[in-house]
């Protein structure tokens, strides 16, 4: 699985004018299941992100996790993280997991983040979403499992 993690002061996701999820300080996690991914990859990535120390401590160093700070997570599916731009001008997405697998792994990933004690909001898999965020830092990190 692939994830793009952004430290945010706030974030929200809207579908057809309805706000599905919003958080205050925490992480916006854009996530994509890849061909061949399974439950093990979803679990491993969620565990790593839950422990990722990208929030400042009292000394101003990135030494605290979202759990340590009492922050939340907004998890949004984004198959475009599987983009292959190596040829031509139009990206290919054949490396993404099939939609049924992608949705199952997306839901599992979000559930695993929540099981780590992190308040978790989500978007809607496969929907045309509007995502708003206020970056903090900015801090943006790419992870794969």
Swiss-Prot record:
Gene3D superfamilies: D-tyrosyl-tRNA(Tyr) deacylase. GO terms for biological process: D-amino acid catabolic process. Its EC number is 3.1.1.96. A motif (Gly-cisPro motif, important for rejection of L-amino acids) lies at residues 137-138. It is found in: Cytoplasm. Its main location: cytoplasm. GO terms for molecular function: D-tyrosyl-tRNA(Tyr) deacylase activity; Gly-tRNA(Ala) deacylase activity; Ser(Gly)-tRNA(Ala) hydrolase activity; tRNA binding. Pfam families: Tyr_Deacylase. GO terms for cellular component: cytoplasm. It catalyses: glycyl-tRNA(Ala) + H2O = tRNA(Ala) + glycine + H(+); a D-aminoacyl-tRNA + H2O = a tRNA + a D-alpha-amino acid + H(+). Keywords: Cytoplasm, Hydrolase, RNA-binding, tRNA-binding. InterPro entries: Daa-tRNA_deacyls_DTD, DTD-like_sf. Signal peptide: none annotated. A Gly-cisPro motif from one monomer fits into the active site of the other monomer to allow specific chiral rejection of L-amino acids. Homodimer. Belongs to the DTD family. An aminoacyl-tRNA editing enzyme that deacylates mischarged D-aminoacyl-tRNAs. Also deacylates mischarged glycyl-tRNA(Ala), protecting cells against glycine mischarging by AlaRS. Acts via tRNA-based rather than protein-based catalysis; rejects L-amino acids rather than detecting D-amino acids in the active site. By recycling D-aminoacyl-tRNA to D-amino acids and free tRNA molecules, this enzyme counteracts the toxicity associated with the formation of D-aminoacyl-tRNA entities in vivo and helps enforce protein L-homochirality. This is D-aminoacyl-tRNA deacylase. It comes from Cereibacter sphaeroides (strain KD131 / KCTC 12085).
């Amino acid at each position: 699985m692939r994830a793009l993690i952004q430290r945010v002061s706030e974030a929200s996701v809207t579908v057809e004018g309805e706000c599905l999820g919003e958080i205050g300080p925490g992480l916006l996690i854009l996530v994509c299941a890849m061909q061949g991914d399974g439950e093990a990859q979803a679990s491993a990535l969620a565990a790593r992100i839950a422990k990722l120390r990208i929030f400042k401590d009292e000394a101003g160093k990135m030494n605290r996790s979202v759990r340590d700070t009492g922050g939340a997570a907004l998890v949004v599916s984004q198959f475009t993280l599987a983009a292959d731009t190596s040829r031509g001008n139009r990206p290919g997405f054949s490396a993404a997991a099939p939609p049924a697998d992608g949705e199952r792994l997306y839901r599992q990933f979000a559930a695993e983040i929540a099981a780590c004690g992190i308040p978790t909001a989500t978007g809607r898999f496969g929907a045309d979403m509007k995502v708003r965020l206020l970056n903090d830092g900015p801090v943006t990190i790419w992870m794969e499992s």
